[in-house]
């Protein structure tokens, strides 16, 4: 009997929620709303391209020698995965370090507003999700860092929208504690007028307030503020189209 790859069980990840008490399927949900400058030409070609690059751990510096010939562990940076999404006249670059896996990327555009969402996909939707221990989950919400860099794009190629529905993380959106998740934020004000950005991390299978955190960032009318975004009303998720 042939079992589709998406349904095959493996020891470290599963296509349905784990029954184990101490295991968690951690997910991340990143929502961004960009208002472009008034004079920016309207471009509603969303999902023009998505590229993913993982920068592996940095090689130890050969010039640095320790006394016992072993390389120092502290010099090795954890790998960062970058997603570059081009669409709607923007190139949005997101970097994720020590975070849950991104499995779904979607965009929508309406006039001068471009929205994007990057998220994990909860088990049971045909994508595997690793189950990690409670301790690993606590470390993840402390260590996960998301960086963002938004540039202007003059890409003219057509949208490459996928026909499947946008899959989501299923993380609950109740009020949770803040954690400093957002790292560097860079915007090109030539085309970006306002920016609202929300990140949420949590257990995708069961509500666990201890494992749910959020962070937010706003850049409105030239001034930045952190932690102030209400992600539930930030964008209309029903209008998003799948880019991957």
Curated annotation (Swiss-Prot):
Biased composition (Acidic residues): 54-77
GO cellular component: host cell cytoplasm
Record keywords: Early protein, Host cytoplasm
Presence of the UniProt keyword Cell inner membrane in the record: no
The protein's name: Inactive chemokine-binding protein
Disordered: annotated span: 1-79
Compartments reported by the entry: Host cytoplasm
Composition bias type Polar residues, residue spans: 37-53
Job of this protein: The protein is truncated in this vaccinal strain and presumably inactive, because the lack of signal peptide prevents the protein of being secreted. In the wild-type viruses inhibits host immune defense by binding to host chemokines. Binds host CC chemokines (beta chemokines) such as RANTES with high affinity, but not CXC or C chemokines (alpha and gamma chemokines).
Domain of life of the source: Viruses
Pfam family, one: Orthopox_35kD
Induction: Expressed in the early phase of the viral replicative cycle.
Main location: host cell
Keyword Thylakoid: no
Family named by the database record: Belongs to the orthopoxvirus OPG001 family.
